[in-house]
Amino acid sequence: MARIAGVNIPDNKHAVISLTYIFGVGRTTAQKILEAVGIAPSTKVSQLDDTQLDAIRAQVSEYMTEGDLRREVSMNIKRLVDLGCYRGIRHRRNLPVRGQNTKNNARTRKGPTRPLKR
């Protein structure tokens, strides 16, 4: 298994799919990285040599990935909560943030149902 950005990516998959195992790298970003390096997206990771892997590592390091991206996302949410704005309040109460209705659905965000106390 090749190690890129602190993540073991699978050898038996196409390079474009393997790169998506890195947090912050989706299909489009993976295609851009491989295009910049000059590798066909359908190439298996096991067929890549060390120079190609180093070139991919260099390209991936230009993007914000893994721990840095997770930290930035959590800091953005913390900033909203500290501001006390509507979105921050919704985050604090574990409710949907983007305007969805909560009368019937939103069970994923709200958690399991609580029994009525009588």
UniProtKB/Swiss-Prot annotation:
GO cellular component labels: cytosol; small ribosomal subunit
| Job description of the protein | Located at the top of the head of the 30S subunit, it contacts several helices of the 16S rRNA. In the 70S ribosome it contacts the 23S rRNA (bridge B1a) and protein L5 of the 50S subunit (bridge B1b), connecting the 2 subunits; these bridges are implicated in subunit movement. Contacts the tRNAs in the A and P-sites.
Could you tell me which InterPro entries the record lists for this protein?
Rbsml_uS13_C (IPR027437), Ribosomal_uS13 (IPR001892), Ribosomal_uS13-like_H2TH (IPR010979), Ribosomal_uS13_bac-type (IPR019980), Ribosomal_uS13_CS (IPR018269)
Query: What Pfam families is this protein classified in?
Result: Ribosomal_S13
Where does the record place Basic residues bias?
106-118
Q: Which UniProt keywords apply?
A: Ribonucleoprotein, Ribosomal protein, RNA-binding, rRNA-binding, tRNA-binding
What the entry lists under PROSITE patterns is as follows: RIBOSOMAL_S13_1 (PS00646), RIBOSOMAL_S13_2 (PS50159)
What family, per the record? Belongs to the universal ribosomal protein uS13 family.
UniProt key word Electron transport:
no
Q: What is this protein called?
A: Small ribosomal subunit protein uS13
Please list the GO biological process terms of this entry. translation
Q: Does the keyword Cell membrane apply?
A: no
For this protein, the record's HAMAP family field holds: Ribosomal_uS13 (MF_01315)
Q: Name one GO molecular function term.
A: structural constituent of ribosome
Cite the record's note on assembly: Part of the 30S ribosomal subunit. Forms a loose heterodimer with protein S19. Forms two bridges to the 50S subunit in the 70S ribosome.
Q: Which domain of life is it from?
A: Bacteria
Region described as Disordered: 92-118
